[in-house]
A protein has these predicted regions:
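Conserved active-site and cofactor/substrate-binding residues in soluble primary-metabolism enzymes
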Residues: 16, 20, 24, 34-41, ...
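Phosphate/diphosphate-binding glycine-rich loops and adjacent basic-rich segments that engage nucleotide
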Residues: 157-234
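N-terminal glycine-rich anion-binding loops that anchor highly charged ligand groups
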Residues: 13-21, 34-60, 74-85, 288-291
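Active-site cofactor/substrate anionic-group-binding motifs, chiefly glycine-
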Residues: 57-111
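Catalytic-core signal marking the mid-to-C-terminal active-site face
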Residues: 2-8, 12-21, 31, 266, ...
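Secondary-shell segments that build the walls of catalytic and ion/ligand-binding clefts
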Residues: 208-276, 283
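A generic, well-ordered mixed alpha/beta core segment in the N-terminal half of proteins
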Residues: 87-180, 186-192
């Protein structure tokens, strides 16, 4: 469940239509030299992410992608290909391209196998950042399948429980399951207390971050977003400090988030043959690809239940949760995916709110690429 943003008419904010955001992303990717099919897929995933309110993984990622292409590590002409496959499994090489297209390909292949065999599992190697994991799990639930998506990460930013220096990434998990009457149950979460890009969003908005997201080298909480960004992105990792695992502290069971992050890396990174970032960076040159790994699983509930039974039972579960008496009047119990579904409908109708600080950075990218700025 993503955090709400300030009203779009608040000072320091602009509003852009989903179509303009989509066209802005697409125009920049094409201007950078990405192939039409890859650019269209990436733009579709990114604008859907912004529509869903996951503002850390949509258009705000363009500056990061620009840096990667300038370093030469991002293959703008990537052609993902299947390296090996069985009736149930497959392994894809993303050819060092942006992860969106290879991830869509991976989930589609998992879904095809899920329909035929009851379950399909596909891993991807040699990839880059792929946006929000929830998009790919929702691909499956939109077609009546259960979808699971995991990913390793490039940035070393999460300090293991009892550790001083970061070793892991945010290592996201996304799971989506279809109901009959209700929208799909969709969980999309980092295994750290927060995603590093969410810290970036708070800095763009000029807000402090919640306590417990980031700690310094002494293990003390950091709430100033600018200082948190310095710890996460600007200073040497051996100084220490970073994101906390889910749970925030040993006293609050952060070993569980630490363990989940390890599970994600084993399935998405180790199983696919992708890199482990603390080892990769020892020899990685600026132009070397990140070699991230992804994991996709699609399950057909009809392989286990009579058609419709699973969806009906999930409706009962969701309805029961929604009718749970709230601790505070006016704050009803929500189900994962509720806020994103509501945000998606609202933003489709009223537009996507963007901080002016972000809009200025996008304008600079447009000026550099000689493409029109469409967000005004």
């Amino acid at each position: 469940m993503s955090a709400r943003v300030p009203p779009s008419d608040a000072p320091g904010w602009i509003t852009a239509s989903a179509e303009n955001v989509h066209q802005q992303i697409l125009s920049l990717l094409l201007a950078w030299g990405m192939s039409g099919e890859q650019a269209r897929t990436s733009a579709a995933v990114m604008v859907d992410t912004d529509l869903s309110g996951v503002d850390s993984h949509g258009i705000s990622m363009l500056m990061d992608y620009d840096q990667s292409r300038r370093k030469g590590k991002l293959n703008l002409h990537a052609k993902p290909r299947v390296l090996r496959e069985t009736a149930v499994t497959a392994l894809i090489d993303a050819d060092a391209g942006l992860g969106h297209a290879a991830a869509v390909m991976g989930m589609r292949m998992a879904m095809e196998r899920g329909r035929r065999q009851g379950v399909g599992i596909v891993t991807v190697r040699n990839s880059h950042h792929f946006g929000a994991a929830g998009y790919y799990s929702r691909m499956a639930s939109a077609e009546g399948l259960l979808g699971l998506c995991l990913s390793s990460t490039r940035t070393i930013n999460t300090v293991p429980t009892r550790g001083r220096v970061p070793v892991l990434g945010t290592n996201p998990i996304a799971f989506s399951a279809p109901a009959r009457r209700n929208p799909p149950f969709t969980l999309d979460m980092a295994t750290s207390s927060a995603a590093s890009n969410k810290v970036k969003v708070y800095e763009l908005r000029g807000h402090d971050i919640p306590g417990g997201w980031v700690v310094d080298e002494q293990g003390e909480q950091v709430t100033n977003a600018a200082r948190a960004m310095e710890i996460l992105f600007q200073r040497p990792k051996d100084i220490g400090g970073g994101l906390t695992p889910l749970g925030a502290s040993a006293e609050m069971s952060s070993h569980k988030g630490y363990g989940l992050a390890m599970m994600v890396h084993i399935l998405a990174g180790t199983l696919s043959g992708s890199s482990f970032s603390p080892v990769r960076v020892r020899t990685q040159r600026p132009q070397d690809p990140d070699n991230l790994g992804h994991f996709f699983c699609a399950i057909d509930p009809a392989a286990f239940r009579a058609p419709g039974e699973f969806e009906d039972d999930l409706d009962t579960v969701i309805d029961t949760l929604r009718t749970t008496p709230p601790a505070r009047p006016g704050e009803p119990v929500l189900v994962h995916g509720d806020i994103e579904t509501e945000t998606r409908e609202r933003r489709k109708a009223k537009g996507i709110p963007l901080p002016e600080t972000l809009a200025r950075k996008i304008r600079a990218l447009c000026d550099d690429a000689n493409v029109p700025f469409l967000l005004a």
